[in-house]
Amino acid sequence: MRMIIIAVCALLFGMNTAIADGHDKANAFGFALNVPAEHIADVEEILTSHMKFMQSTHSVTGDASTRLNSYSVIKGPVLVDPTDPSKGTTGAMMYILSEHYETPAGFAKHMQASTGWSDLPRMQEMMMKFGVGAVYPGFHMQSMNR
């Protein structure tokens, strides 16, 4: 029950944040996770579910007004000392997820579609537990593509 309450509050807060104070112009967001080794498999399961959700609800070639321009998840080991990789890794994994939409309408469509995704509560819990940074709402600044 506690998880349901947390998920509903996070969703409502997120939707209000996205449309408050001019943030309805957002067309991107991203977040970073620092995940201890013992939770990596669970996080990757959630991210795999998220990718399937994205593939089933988003288009990179369709209507320009709601088109997803880019979606990526990158991962890499957390270094003991980022200035000296020779010191090794901590065993944790860093993940960075980013999404960029052609227009704010695409971002709004994503927020609406996410309410029907069964793993949304798990994703939100993961972000709260392991999140070390987020850009939400975000605004596409620059890109370089092939």
Describe the residue ranges of each PLM region:
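Active-site-flanking beta-strand signature of metal-NTP-handling nucleotidyl enzymes
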Residues: 26-34, 96-98
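Short amphipathic alpha-helical segments
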Residues: 39-74, 114-123
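Charge-dense polyanion-binding interfaces
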Residues: 121-146
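Short, glycine- and small/hydrophobic-rich beta-strand elements in well-ordered beta-sheets
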Residues: 55-96, 131
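Short amphipathic alpha-helices within nucleic acid-binding modules
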Residues: 41, 102-113
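Positively charged n-region of N-terminal signal peptides that target proteins for export
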Residues: 1-4
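Bacterial N-terminal signal peptides
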Residues: 6-14
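Sec/Tat signal peptide C-region and signal peptidase I cleavage site
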Residues: 15-20
